Amino acid sequence: MKYIEVDEELYRLIASKTERIGESASEILRRLLGLEVEASATQEKDEPEVISQPGLEETADVEDKPRFIDLHSSINKEELAAAKGAVGRFLFILEAVYLASPEQFAQVLKIKGRDRLYFATSKQSLLKASKSANPKEIGQSGYWVTTNNNTAKKRTILTEVLHQYGTVEAQIESITRNI
């Protein structure tokens, strides 16, 4: 497998042409260009595909109730608006969450999909889990997040993070709408 860099516009175009969860960029491009798609990627499975739902796959261990932090006031609206694209806003909000309570942030490592790792403490861990993860560091936190998810999935992941911080539902909706 070779890696190429594409600009944001091409990335969004390719991502918008996704027809099924887990479809790789190579599969999308092959389909769009009319090339033969690898048989193993498109074969029907005996069992229906399970869609990843962060926070629903694993039951969390019983732990102390997270202390409430008003994250809404921690997010600078002007800086958020200046963030580049959905990925930039996603990273900006995650960094604000980290800065609000760094000692609590390690909880995000528990947020995983069925066969998907969303957070890690190294870029290599995310790339090992998925070659197409496109990991980005969350500010200077030392935590990394997968960014090759669509905006809806980013919102779902962020919702789970905010739940771990004890954020109230109204604030969660308000914050995640900003991605």
Swiss-Prot record:
One of its GO terms (molecular function) is DNA binding. Belongs to the SeqA family. Negative regulator of replication initiation, which contributes to regulation of DNA replication and ensures that replication initiation occurs exactly once per chromosome per cell cycle. Binds to pairs of hemimethylated GATC sequences in the oriC region, thus preventing assembly of replication proteins and re-initiation at newly replicated origins. Repression is relieved when the region becomes fully methylated. Coiled coil: none annotated. It comes from Shewanella woodyi (strain ATCC 51908 / MS32). Keywords: Cytoplasm, DNA replication inhibitor, DNA-binding. HAMAP family: SeqA. Residues 86-87 are annotated as: Interaction with DNA. This is Negative modulator of initiation of replication. The gene is seqA. Pfam families: SeqA, SeqA_N. InterPro entries: Arc_rbn_hlx_hlx, Ribbon_hlx_hlx, SeqA, SeqA_DNA-bd_C, SeqA_DNA-bd_C_sf, SeqA_N. Homodimer. Polymerizes to form helical filaments. It is found in: Cytoplasm. The keyword DNA-binding applies. One of its GO terms (cellular component) is cytoplasm. One of its GO terms (biological process) is negative regulation of DNA-templated DNA replication initiation. The keyword Disulfide bond does not apply. SUPFAM superfamilies: Replication modulator SeqA, C-terminal DNA-binding domain, Ribbon-helix-helix.
